[in-house]
Amino acid sequence: MRLAVAALVSTLALAAACAAAVATSAAPSTSTAPRHEPILPVQAEDTYYKSAAEAVDIRIAERGIKPAKNVILFVGDGMGVSTITASRIYAGQSAGVDGESFRLAMESLPWSALSKTYSHDYQVSDSAATATAMTAGLKTKSGFLGVSSAANFGNCASAQGTEADTLFEIAQRAGLATGVISTARITHATPGATYAKVPHRNWEADADMRGASSDTCKDIARQLIEGPSSDFDVILGGGRAKFLPAETPDPEYPDQTGERADGRNLMEEWAAKDGTRKTVFDRAGFAAIDFASDVKVFGLFEPSHMQYELDREADTAGEPSLEEMTRAAITRLSRNEDGFVLMVEGGRIDHAHHAGNAIRALEDTLAFDAAIAAALEMTNAEDTLIIVTADHSHSLTINGYPQRGNPILGLVTAGASSEGGSLGADGLPYTTLSYANGPGACRETDKDAEGKPEYDCKRYDLTGIDTGAPDFRQQSLVPLYSETHGGEDVAAFASGPGANLISGVIEQNEIFHVMGRAVGLIPAPAAEE
């Protein structure tokens, strides 16, 4: 049994019990008393912001809202509905029980909605714009982090004056504890949306800015350690290279170095700010930290993204699981009597999908779900709002007419009443999971005289191939080097105070307003005028 499934099964019963208690506590209430003095974000006049604020305010007037002390936003990057369904079946089958009727921890949360993920300029958005919608309450252009649609892509000067306050920055100003966790680089789009303000999501280090003036725009890593986010209590993820000088060897991989061209070691600069800070890069260092103390922790466990869950145990220096990081963060942030705001991202679900590698996407979804179960166990349903959602979907499909119990990663095995049988019109078998586009459409067959790969893009025979192998890539229709995002609505699950506002079909940027109003950090629209 795979580690992610084992962790999930061990916590699922407890998560279901927690969710049962949550269902009672999340019932509509006429109480709207804020816990804090609301802070008006600088983006309050943005059209998208105002529209979402008004929509949430109407629901509050109709349903009421209980005040929350804490907020946890779980973002499964690229975790569309088909990913959730496939992961559910995979979890059950891996545990030796019925997969189709299995239930993930996230699915036990009592409130749910569909969230519309389009950006200001794209039907199918990227993670930067969608994450900004959830952390700052406005829709913006794809590729933008923490700036409004008034800016121009890659133009530093145009971004000046378009910056948005994030819920995490507002929470800090109000005295709450704050944290961000991701299995991706901590400067990547989704975690970066908690603090960064750039018109180009790829400006993760100064060396990435390519001609942009560092006097006008700061790279994302520099913003993390120089801005309000420098005082985040817990920062855990990957991406060390963006914080280390180009001449500095990586502490885990001596043959690799940092990526910064300015010679600055931003991790050392962060640690030197006061005596309460600890940096960490491996599992042993993580385990040695007393998260029940007032320590601030900055942990970056890989030069780039953290390992996929399927590969994590083989990591050279070892790294904690997403569940372990979540437990540590909640332990640390709960010390603040005023409450906390935390983001937890399962960032590598998305990367596996881009690679057309469904098994790693499913394994990382289950690791993400185990973190959700841990949060349900550790928090009080009466005072903690938990929202679980995705930033966008992917082109993963569950297709054919496979029989009940057919391995979700296997070939379609049709039953007697199935239309179309188990083979395609070309006489070849196909898998239940496939992608509309991506690298699985072609196979490298040879190299030309210059060493460039040659490809065969005809559908190949899967007979005798282990389609559940770790490196198997599901077949796809349109050949692309990287599979794309999907534009359909994504699921949002919620529990705790304010969860009753997560229902129906909502705009993605309304999630910010639900969180902000529940914890009392942002004012109602009437108070903004």
Predicted segments with their positions:
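A post-motif C-terminal structural segment
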Residues: 38-50, 64-69, 79-85, 89-132, ...
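Glycine-rich phosphate/pyrophosphate-binding loops
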Residues: 163, 168, 173-193, 525-527
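Alpha-helix C-terminal capping segments
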Residues: 135-137, 169-175, 226-228, 378
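N-terminal export and membrane-targeting signals
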Residues: 1-7
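Short glycine- and acidic-rich boundary segments immediately preceding or forming the N-terminal edge
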Residues: 2, 19-63
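Bacterial N-terminal signal peptides
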Residues: 7-17
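His/Cys-centered metal/cofactor-coordination and adjacent catalytic loops
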Residues: 146-161
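Structural beta-sheet core signal
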Residues: 73-74, 180, 388
